């Protein structure tokens, strides 16, 4: 039997195994090092090993070091209640420590000698300032640092003798200043799309206790004294009742507000908003990057909703729809289902240029009825309207503007998405009310949005119109003044029309005038359902920024919702106005977004065509690199 063939194995020397192993490890480590260095280059940027890299602008190398003035001389004005003066300063200390920014509390004498390495000076109610202290503040600003002040700062000398408003107006860039002590609580309305807007809703109406307020006459204030409908108090211009401003003074940044920064203990939600305003002011004054998400798509600065209430007079409404269609604008028509069922073709025409929504079954208020009774009527109206034209009926306008706390619950039970709410205005943008959809899935929420009517409707304006019998430009101006106010806030303007009032043919020229002006502005004109779709998707997006080197800022955008968000913009407040900007993604599959440097406040607008659901985006912003 033949022996099986065999092969001889070659034995490599042990040194060869060691050589190949070492070479393989060296190659692997080299590749990992190259990848790591590429990642560093794509995030931190080029760096020097033996020397520190110099920034193009010193603001990029500064940290946050806060000095708070505890002014005993100013406290003497509160001799009967010294604690009232100390409370705002103590709140500043608590807020800063909670943020991880331990402040340095200084005396009047220390302020007069200089501020050392501080980058932000806080002056809570420092009315009494001596000559040396004023000089220190002016030098501090000339060095490009930041000051945050409140109340009648600098209106008295070191002996607390009255000196006038010159120091305050010079500090803030205001034309004039005054004091005002209301007898009751008053409302303060905050502008939107500003550096503090991440947690303060646009047009937020904040009630503050009766106190001595300091008012400025200043252009483009961040907050102003208002009434319940977010209108400037006493019919004055917004600029004449300014309660908060931010301003560039020389090379420095100034934030000022004229109200107390503490609220009663039971107002914890509103207090957290004020605390956020304080912290955001510190970051902005210290020239740290801040990112906020824009309110509206396609670079628009506000939104407008054309709402037509159709009751009985469908002929006027049909003519009105033809006018709006000729203007190329969408509108939302609110109909009660009883009348709409008899005018099916008209309702289809309304739907073709926008959206049909509900006024209930009969056009009578639901206020005061039990939630179940309200829900049954709302559900029936929804079914009847959807039989006329296929499509979802998602919106409801309370007849005569009357609703109660049960209405929003009934709307959710009946499958609606929004209410055009007139009562209890809280802000200039939609307020989302969520409901647990299932006890087994507590994190799944149904949402109903309140769209507040923060402007007068045609009934109010026509009732107060005293112009010529033939409508003139003055009548259109009554609507447009409200539109400009809401646009300034960055909110939603509701152009609310009754078919039997402004829908009459003799007012068509006025309507066309108003619509032409709205269309010419950077305002997103849309329907109620589209507005709510956008706002609920936007509400799930978070943005954040941080400085990672003397030339680079990291921008993080996360869409945590289940719907894509299209044509959104992020406004990035930069430490300074760079000459050259580049934006790159740290993930190679992401495209770099388009961007534009705005001509105020060192703001970089970054535009995103789509933010996909459940997706995080990280970009590096390179400044003068």
Question: Each predicted region: which residue ranges?
Answer:
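Aromatic-Pro/Gly-enriched surface loop or interdomain linker
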Residues: 16-117, 263-265, 280, 284-287, ...
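N-terminal pre-catalytic segment of deacetylase/amide-hydrolase enzymes
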Residues: 100, 214-305
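A glycine-rich, often tryptophan-bearing local segment used as a flexible ligand/cofactor-contacting loop or short
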Residues: 127-197
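Metal-dependent polysaccharide deacetylase catalytic core of the NodB/CE4 family, i.e.
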Residues: 155-156, 161-163, 301-304, 321, ...
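Catalytic beta-strand/loop cores that center a nucleophilic Ser/Cys/Thr
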Residues: 181-250, 443, 451, 474-475
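Surface-exposed beta-strand/loop patches in extracellular or lumenal glycoproteins
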Residues: 206-213, 558-579
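Catalytic grooves of carbohydrate-active enzymes
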Residues: 301-312, 414, 451-530
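C-terminal beta-strand-rich structural cap/linker in extracellular carbohydrate-active enzymes
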Residues: 598-625
């Amino acid at each position: 039997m033949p022996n099986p063939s065999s092969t001889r194995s070659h034995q490599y020397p042990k040194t060869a195994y060691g050589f190949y192993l070492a070479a393989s490890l060296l190659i692997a480590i080299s590749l990992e090092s190259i990848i790591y260095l590429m990642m560093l280059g794509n995030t931190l940027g080029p760096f020097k090993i033996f020397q520190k890299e110099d920034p193009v602008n010193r603001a990029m190398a500064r940290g946050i070091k806060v000095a708070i003035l505890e002014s005993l001389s100013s406290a003497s004005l509160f001799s009967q209640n010294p604690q009232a003066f100390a409370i705002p300063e103590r709140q500043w200390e608590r807020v800063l420590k909670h943020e991880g920014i331990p402040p340095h509390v200084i005396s009047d004498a220390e302020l007069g000698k200089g501020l050392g390495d501080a980058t932000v000076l806080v002056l809570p109610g420092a009315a009494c300032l001596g000559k040396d202290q004023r000089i220190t503040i002016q030098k501090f600003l000339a060095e490009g640092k930041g000051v945050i002040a409140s109340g009648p700062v600098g209106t008295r000398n070191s002996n607390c003798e009255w000196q006038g408003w010159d120091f305050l107006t010079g500090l803030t860039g205001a034309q004039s200043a005054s004091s005002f002590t209301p007898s009751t609580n008053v409302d303060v309305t905050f502008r939107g799309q500003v550096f503090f807007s991440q947690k303060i809703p646009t047009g937020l109406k904040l009630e503050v206790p009766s106190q001595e307020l300091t008012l400025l006459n200043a252009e483009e204030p961040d907050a102003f004294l208002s009434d319940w409908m977010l209108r400037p108090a006493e019919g004055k211009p917004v600029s004449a009742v300014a309660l908060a401003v931010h301003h560039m003074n020389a090379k420095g940044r100034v934030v000022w507000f004229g109200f107390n920064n503490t609220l009663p203990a039971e107002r914890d939600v509103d207090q957290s908003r004020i605390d956020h305003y304080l912290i955001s002011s510190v970051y902005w004054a210290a020239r740290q990057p801040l990112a906020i998400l824009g309110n509206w798509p396609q670079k628009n600065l506000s939104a407008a909703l054309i709402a037509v209430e159709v009751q009985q007079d469908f002929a006027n409404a049909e003519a009105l729809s033809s006018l709006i269609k000729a203007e190329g604008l969408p509108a939302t028509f609110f109909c009660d289902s009883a009348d709409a069922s008899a005018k099916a073709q008209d309702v289809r025409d309304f739907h073709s240029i926008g959206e049909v929504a509900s006024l209930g079954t009969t056009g009578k208020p639901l206020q005061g009825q039990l939630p179940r009774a309200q829900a049954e009527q709302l559900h029936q109206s929804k079914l009847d309207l959807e039989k006329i034209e296929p499509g979802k009926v998602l919106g409801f306008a309370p007849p005569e503007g009357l609703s109660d706390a049960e209405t929003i619950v009934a709307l959710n039970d009946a499958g609606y998405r929004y209410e055009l709410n007139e009562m209890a205005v809280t802000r200039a943008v939609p307020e989302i009310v969520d409901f647990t959809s299932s006890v087994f899935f507590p994190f799944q929420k149904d949402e109903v949005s309140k769209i507040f009517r923060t402007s007068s409707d045609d009934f109010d304006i026509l009732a107060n119109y005293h112009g010529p019998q033939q409508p003139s430009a003055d009548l259109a101006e009554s609507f447009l003044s409200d539109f400009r106010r809401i646009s300034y806030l960055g909110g939603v303007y509701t152009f609310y029309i009754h078919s039997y009032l402004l829908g009459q043919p003799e007012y068509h020229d006025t309507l066309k005038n108003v619509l032409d002006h709205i269309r010419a502005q950077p305002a997103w004109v849309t329907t109620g359902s589209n507005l709510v779709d956008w706002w609920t998707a936007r509400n799930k997006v978070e943005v954040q920024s941080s400085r990672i080197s003397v030339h680079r800022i990291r921008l993080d955008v996360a869409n945590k919702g289940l719907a894509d968000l299209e044509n959104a913009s992020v406004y990035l407040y930069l430490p300074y106005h760079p000459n050259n900007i580049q934006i790159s993604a740290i993930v190679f599959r992401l495209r770099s977004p388009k961007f534009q440097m705005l001509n105020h406040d060192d703001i970089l607008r970054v535009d995103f065509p789509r933010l996909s659901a459940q997706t995080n985006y990280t970009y590096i912003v390179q400044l003068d690199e």
